[in-house]
Amino acid sequence: MSKKPVRVAVTGAAGQIGYALLFRIASGEMLGKDQPVILQLLEIPDEKAQNALKGVIMELEDCAFPLLAGIEAHSDPMTAFKDTDYALLVGARPRGPGMERADLLAANAQIFTAQGKALNAVASRNVKVLVVGNPANTNAYIAMKSAPDLPAKNFTAMLRLDHNRAASQLAAKGGFKVGDIKKLTVWGNHSPTMYADYRFATVDGKSVKDAINDQAWNKDVFLPTVGKRGAAIIAARGLSSAASAANAAIDHMRDWALGSKGEWVTMGVPSNGEYGIPAGIVFGFPVTTENGEYKIVEGLAIDAFSQECIDKTLAELQGEQDGVKHLL
């Protein structure tokens, strides 16, 4: 028996990441090759953006995806999020020249407060929300706080791009196949302060840390390379990473919806006090997923260097949160 279509809302749908994302969702890469989807696409109510969205929709139609059961164009989150089962919040205000961080936080607080309220009002009560637009953790926190009738655990931020970047760097350093690396995680904020942690990682059951055995490389090369990878891509391409961000969003949602089969993945999720992270902060943790639920991997030893890295990324997140509290 064929499955009933699910509703997937995507914001910033005509942007670079949206363009790299939508065709893959429509082809079944995110929710499975047997799951029809209805795309509910949101763009700002600006004529240029809405026209660009029309063009993307024409292309989606021209792919004749068997799983694409419907496409809607919206300029208002109250209609875009109606009954949605999955919401990928990609659109955010980018940092412009001369813009202070406080201005960026305030501009995004406005967007994500409105979107959180709309999700609260009209989305499915089991909606799974992934915030991709930066600052992703804080934007997820704002949306979550603006949706008091939805479970806090339904709001997540994307750390999977950092996770995938870290896996790729480790594979290159150790001569591993990237798909063989297990038990890697990224702690904290999706920002250069994130802490990519391979102390528990294995390849074919053997320790990656022992194989690499180079703490100076970890501290001076690996962590800065992963942390500043986004900036390096902007410098090289003149545009921010779009296809890799879309790919990470697909990975995050696919694992959340369909299960990680016991493997660790990284998600930014609201803390319940695990690892000393204050409750409610949206923080990158190692998780496993099954039956549409994620579970934080608990009981991992945190050494002095790791604690220092976790404290640093936590301090940054608390600073961001303090910067938006008066706006909520």
UniProtKB/Swiss-Prot annotation:
Q: What is this protein called?
A: Malate dehydrogenase
Protein family: Belongs to the LDH/MDH superfamily. MDH type 2 family.
Q: What is the lineage of its organism?
A: Bacteria, Pseudomonadati, Pseudomonadota, Betaproteobacteria, Burkholderiales
Give the binding site residues for substrate.
Answer: 95, 101, 134, 165
Record: active site? 190 (proton acceptor)
**Key word Transmembrane helix present:** no
Taxonomy, superkingdom: Bacteria
As its record notes, the protein acts as a catalyst of: (S)-malate + NAD(+) = oxaloacetate + NADH + H(+)
Q: State the protein's purpose.
A: Catalyzes the reversible oxidation of malate to oxaloacetate.
Gene field: mdh
